[in-house]
Regions:
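Conserved acidic/glycine
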Residues: 1-67
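Cofactor-binding active-site loop characterized by glycine-rich and histidine/acidic residues
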Residues: 43-99
Length: 99
């Protein structure tokens, strides 16, 4: 299926990307499933942190799951990613497990 991005991208000194995106229903459902799992992990982490089961700092990523899912859609598993914190979803996106 082809999806058209209605608002054009603004680019500076580069060619703007296409406003047409090719995808499939299964790819969209997979992205939603990944984002949903990431959100559930963040909510569970919040509960554990507030229950004092996680010590130190717990920087949560809820509300940003689509960033990680979109990034993973554009990258390959061979591409390197560097994070400093709020990396629970990156762990899942790279193929890690919630446990």
């Amino acid at each position: 299926m082809t999806i058209e991005i209605p608002v054009p991208f603004k680019a500076h000194n580069i060619e703007a990307p296409s406003q047409m995106v090719e995808t499939s229903k299964s790819e969209i459902v997979d992205m939603f499933t990944q984002a949903y799992l990431m959100r559930r992990l963040e909510i569970a982490s919040d509960v554990l942190y507030k229950g004092k089961f996680i010590r130190g700092f717990c920087h949560l990523y809820d509300g940003q799951e689509a960033v990680c899912v979109g990034m993973e859609a554009a990258l390959t598993k061979e591409d390197a990613i560097v994070t400093s914190y709020r990396d629970h979803c990156t762990h899942l996106g790279r193929g890690g497990t919630p446990l």
